[in-house]
Amino acid sequence: MIEFSCNRTSEDMTPVIRDIEIAKFAQTVLYDYRPELLTYTSYGDDPYYEPALLDPYDFAQNYLGSNIEVHDIYTETKGELIAGAAVFNYQKVKVFDKDNMCTREILVPPNTILLDNETVDHWHKGFEFFTIMHECGHLMLHQRVYRRELVQGFYTTGNVPDSSENAVLCKRSNIGGTRRTGLSTNEDFREHQANTFAGCMLMPPRVFIPYVQKQMRKYDRFEDELMVTRTINDGSGEYWRYVDVVNRTARHFGVSYKAVRVQLAKYGLQADPKDERVKEAKRRLKLYQSLWK
């Protein structure tokens, strides 16, 4: 297994790292795990891209060696629904016992991914897969923040299995790969980093970019292989072309519509021609293409 390392960290060991560096790390991990996830077929002058798809359960269990458990994760904070959790050390987690209609604590072992029943049973499959990879991101990127050594029955920082320092409980509102704006705390940055890792694992730029460009070339009104951004149904042809490409891509990669839109922006594949950020989008596209060119 490829181990993550980072030369720059904050005081609490949160990595200080750019998104492109996380993308490079994710690409290295994919090469080590299943290199075919970074390949596509090509036929003559009209390439036909069919990237292989990552199985988050297989990656978490067989590559990271993590356990995956599903519970009704309980939180006392009103309106704060938990999608999943990454457990680094032995941790007591409060769950809801539907059989007895009460809450109880369970002791969760290290290197465990918890999924809430709502995440698995009622949400889009893409959200479930993204949540698993988000938690894998925490387990791979943030060991130095949370991991404690157990020596003769005691952690090096104290025997505290009920401490919140042993696990990351991730709110549903934080899952999905939001763009890098409004980040102020180290926790914010760690959530962003986990989202970035998940997005780059499920939609690797090496295959995602050519696949999307193939879909875009079906419409001759996209300029310079940049999609016209249309987030509101204004009845224009650009809006429906945008929706079609995003939906096709989401279905193929097994992710949500929202997750695709985030990666399109991150990789520089979408911009509004009336916006000055077109140049920035083109710079991003070249940057992520440099991962394999």
Language model: regions and residue ranges:
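Active-site hotspot residues in diverse enzymes, especially metal/ion-binding acidic/histidine motifs
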Residues: 1-293
